[in-house]
Amino acid sequence: NTDYTFTLNREKITELADGTDRDISNGWFVGHSIKTHYGLEKIGIWQLDEAAEAAKYGEKPGRIKIKDQNKDGSIDNDNDRIILGSETPDFVMGLNNTFKYKNFDLRVFMYWRQGQMLHSEANGYGSYRIQGDPGIKVNYWTPENPTNEFPRPEKSYSDSSKLDALGYVDGSYLKIKEITLGYQLPKSWIGKIHASNIRIYCSLKNFFTFSHLDDYDPERGGSLSYPMTKQAVFGINVDF
């Protein structure tokens, strides 16, 4: 037996009270979702063979590479920030599957949010990460590891607007919220204790998440908080 829900949400701001088309401080833009992300666009990390080009922007290999939107040869908040995406997903889907075979029963509940952008505080407030905190696992750029994921660690680097650009990530995820396996004991086994039904079960909650984010639960919406608690429950239902 399968039950599912499917939700499409389309929202946009049609006008602002002051008659303008944008309110940057609140992140409101006419024609876009209420939960819109606006900032500099990270397009990678400057690599060794791009040293000359990086120098034109006052950068060097291993630092964050920002797209020069207006192609004026410099990066600044006034001219190079754009609408990057929205926290409103393209769709949300829930799927509840129940299977039964003889005395066994299995329930699997899955939840899927697709097409949302999150601002990960763990990345966006990256100064403590880029400064090489030894307690944090990060795929840093080095000459031997020319990744485009995270810049080189530097103790003195503090360009907040570029660090903030690290935080905008694809927040789509598929989560198996619950798996429950049960077994109903045969009547011949339980007759002596005068029970009409005994079912034993095991349930796992929030154990499996599939997303583009490492070591972070996207269900938390980007905030620096504990992930959803994983639970393993063993139980027994007895009817007399």
Task: Locate the predicted segments by residue.
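Membrane-embedded beta-strand positions in outer-membrane beta-barrel channels/transporters
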Residues: 1, 92-96, 178-182, 233-235
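Conserved small-residue
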Residues: 1-87
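Outer-envelope beta-barrel architecture signal
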Residues: 2, 91, 102-104, 172, ...
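Membrane-embedded beta-strand positions of outer-membrane beta-barrel proteins
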Residues: 2-4, 108, 200-202, 236
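Transmembrane beta-strands of outer-membrane beta-barrel pores
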Residues: 6-12, 101-103, 112-116, 178, ...
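C-terminal beta-signal and terminal closure region of outer-membrane beta-barrel proteins
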Residues: 24-43, 150, 161-163, 207-240
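Extracytoplasmic loops and strand-loop junctions of Gram-negative outer membrane beta-barrel proteins
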Residues: 74-83, 88, 134-137, 159-167, ...
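Extracytoplasmic gating/loop element in the C-terminal half of outer-membrane beta-barrel translocons
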Residues: 113-200, 204
